[in-house]
């Protein structure tokens, strides 16, 4: 799954996004925060990174 697809998934779960530093977005959900890299549309995110972001946001 690339970062755009993962961002759409997170948005459906009620996550809001703010610009971060460089090519990153700050993801916020229920007072919890994580960082999502936006390093190009076709680049795949690792499963460990997606799992950590979901855990940080209380989705897992």
Specify the residue positions occupied by each region the protein language model found.
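Basic nucleic-acid-binding interfaces
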Residues: 1-19, 28-60
